[in-house]
Amino acid sequence: MIYKVYYQENANEIPVRENTKSLYLEAASEREVRQKLKDRNYNIEFVQLLEGNYLEYEQASPNFVLEEI
């Protein structure tokens, strides 16, 4: 399954919506996504499962790149 992760790069700073970034990651569950990213200093705001039409829409975006972890 493919997940879209919304995050702030520095977990020690106050989250600001304009600084929110996203990445795409393949994993079996949301828990696995969080475990894969735990060594990074990210403030994870939201993990969203992509499927169906929404996945197709995201894959059509030039910003769609699966992270390799």
Curated annotation (Swiss-Prot):
Pfam families for the chain = RpoY
- Give me the gene this protein comes from: rpoY
Which UniProt key words apply to this protein? Answer: DNA-directed RNA polymerase, Nucleotidyltransferase, Transcription, Transferase
EC id: 2.7.7.6
NCBIfam families named in the record: PRK13667.1 (NF010188)
User: What does this protein do, in the record's words?
Assistant: A non-essential component of RNA polymerase (RNAP).
Q: What is this protein called?
A: DNA-directed RNA polymerase subunit epsilon
User: What's any GO biological process attached to this entry?
Assistant: DNA-templated transcription
**Top enzyme class:** transferase
Q: What is the lineage of its organism?
A: Bacteria, Bacillati, Bacillota, Bacilli, Bacillales
Q: Which GO terms describe its cellular component?
A: DNA-directed RNA polymerase complex
Oligomer status and interactors: RNAP is composed of a core of 2 alpha, a beta and a beta' subunit. The core is associated with a delta subunit, and at least one of epsilon or omega. When a sigma factor is associated with the core the holoenzyme is formed, which can initiate transcription.
What the entry lists under InterPro entries is as follows: RpoY
Q: Which reaction does it catalyse?
A: RNA(n) + a ribonucleoside 5'-triphosphate = RNA(n+1) + diphosphate
Can the keyword Nucleotidyltransferase be found in this entry's annotation?
Answer: yes
Coiled-coil annotation: which residues?
none
